[in-house]
Amino acid sequence: GCFDCFLLAGRYTLLDQTSLEKLMPICENNNISLILGGVFNSGILINPSPESYFDYTKLDSNWFENLTKSLVRIPKDHESAEFWLNKANSIKNACESFDTTLKKAAIQFPYFNRTVSSCILGMNSSNQVIENIDDYNRKLPSSFWQHLKDNKLIDERSKII
């Protein structure tokens, strides 16, 4: 084929796996790898709060309208700031119950899918480089990933082993 990889931002993350619907199967069937950007979904997967951003848009009461105007993507009717914050906080609570961090889970999750060849992580210091390497290398137990799937916190089609 004419493509060997694509860069995908924010659509195959611990929070949002919408690329499983169409893009991932196309890539898999055509031996196209994905390089993922935005694995922290604009920061919500570091520290979910009403001050967080998702899809480069602040998660306040105007999130839906502001995202629509930004042309990053058109949100679906069920989406709202509350929807995404609740989901992120539910995943964060699951992380805490397994004595881990949301950031560590967000770094490890994409690599279970064999279509993903690499992830681009935003960092601004050498300490963050070291932390991210450590977060990747300290593997979370399969029971954690199964818990996320069993509780519908990640798409059932997500690869977790």
Each language-model region and where it sits:
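Beta/alpha (TIM)-barrel catalytic core signal, keyed to glycine-rich beta->alpha loops juxtaposed to Asp/Glu
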Residues: G1-I160
